[in-house]
């Protein structure tokens, strides 16, 4: 991670199309700092070019990259670099300069046969800025089942099928009473034998198009998005680290008011210092669950130890484990 050691080796940067001589085919790796600086340079150039267009051409709901998408990505990159000032500036640009609006989970349309679950990963969603990634790509590993047998009367055995991957108890238990995200963002596991949903088991599916049984629907449908909710969280975190706690709390209040039942929503007030920063970390986990951001957040949060259990086996990812670094 950038905030762990920006002088560590990252990926090699090849910035032109010239062929290399044979004695230079093994390219040297650039530092993490150099890679991030190049990313920022590229985003700055993209922003500059978009700003030469008229306002109506800077964003169009047509699945293409746009100025607000660039601005949200810049906010995210600056957040990873702990450039709190610019992270907040670009989060605010996304929030204030465009007409995107947070989806109120209290007012979602009633389920239909065509859309039994609300599809947050659609241009119909007022939060969506840019869509990417297919359902088939995202679920290639986690859309698997495991089977087990139970012995019944007279020595008969019955085979059952369960989802191989489910949401952790720790995540599910982090949602407070009245927090609508648990039910709206994550599908419950479906009992294929009894044709009912398990009440205490949640899958890793959600936010994109799902079938009536909570299964991924339409392999080519979009699975991920850049959306407004992240901008509020980026703003809150950047402001909290920049000693602007009132702005951080205001951003959290605006976001969470759309996520809780009105009579159970308690405004986040009085939080300061580390308590506020921890609160924001927890909200990122809940709001952005299964969107591909958690891994990057854990890396910049100090790469904490994680323990997973599978049956009787225990798997431990130690703090600062080399496995926290993606192989190049």
Describe the residue ranges of each PLM region.
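Short, cationic low-complexity segments
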Residues: 151-168
